[in-house]
């Protein structure tokens, strides 16, 4: 995000003209090719009191914080995404195209809202989405926040992989090992058709906070940096962040 914003003076010519910025050098690829990992959460109530819901009592949270501060141990000392995996969603793909994380609680509103019950979930996300977004300037002030448009799930490829990932997560959670823990499905809930799952994905999908690609490395006319991270056509300027990923 900040990589392309930092190159505000070398956006593609049309955008610079629109923003009334004097054009000294323009690169068509600046701010284009925005990519991110989108996730959906397959969530179930847990029939046993063994989840992180036990940790949300304010007193317990304070004690957990003190334990970590003094001893670097306890619940706050490790990632609560305790396990995960990469899976091929069907026999036609030749690489693990879906990633899973298991979390022994509910994520609500990006973690800003505490859960109200014992539950667990799988984070489901396609690895190589084909949808592309863009970042544009909203102001000539270089410190102003840009306009960010991710364009998630704009291709049937991306929607299809997410649907397959959700159905596989359900299959995993319905294995015998989960029988004593698995309660009612919370999300997606009582939906299964492609149309219903598409609506769930579009309404409930969340970012995995992996934006990249807006100053991509390469040699075509949409590339922004070379293999040394040097910006094409500008001396002594490099981009050194995830935006250079093609």
Question: Which stretches of residues belong to each language-model region?
Answer:
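Histidine-centered active-site/metal-ligand motif
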Residues: 2, 37, 210
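Acidic glycine-/aspartate-rich tracts in secreted/extracellular proteins
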Residues: 12, 22, 174-178
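Rossmann-like dinucleotide-binding core of oxidoreductases
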Residues: 18, 34-64, 69-70, 75
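A short alpha-helix-loop-beta-strand transition element characteristic
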Residues: 20-29
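FAD-dependent oxidoreductase catalytic-site/capping-region signature
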Residues: 47-50, 64-246
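Single conserved hydrophobic/aromatic residue that forms the stacking wall/gate
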Residues: 1-11
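Short linear loop/turn motifs
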Residues: 28-33, 215-216
């Amino acid at each position: 995000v900040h990589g392309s914003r930092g190159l505000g003076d070398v956006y593609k010519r049309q955008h610079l003209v629109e923003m009334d910025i004097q054009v000294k050098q323009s690169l068509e690829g600046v701010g284009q090719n925005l990519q991110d990992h989108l996730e959906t959460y397959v969530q179930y109530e847990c029939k046993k009191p063994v989840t992180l819901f036990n940790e949300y009592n304010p007193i317990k949270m304070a004690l957990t914080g003190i334990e970590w501060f003094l001893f670097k141990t306890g619940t706050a000392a490790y990632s609560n995404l305790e396990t995960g995996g990469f899976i091929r969603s069907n026999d036609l793909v030749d690489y693990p195209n879906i990633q899973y994380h298991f979390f022994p609680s509910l994520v609500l509103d990006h973690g800003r809202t505490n859960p109200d019950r014992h539950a667990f979930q799988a984070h489901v996300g396609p690895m190589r989405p084909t949808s592309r977004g863009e970042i544009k300037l909203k102001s000539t002030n270089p410190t102003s926040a840009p306009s960010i448009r991710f364009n998630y799930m704009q291709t049937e490829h991306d929607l299809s992989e997410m649907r397959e990932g959700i159905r596989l997560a359900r299959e995993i959670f319905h294995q015998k090992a989960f029988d004593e823990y698995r309660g009612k499905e919370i999300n997606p809930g009582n939906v299964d058709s492609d149309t219903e799952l598409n609506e769930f994905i579009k309404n409930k999908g969340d970012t995995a906070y992996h934006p990249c690609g807006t100053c991509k490395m390469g040699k075509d006319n949409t590339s922004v940096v070379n293999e040394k991270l040097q910006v094409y056509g500008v001396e002594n300027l490099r981009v050194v962040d995830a935006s250079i990923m093609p």
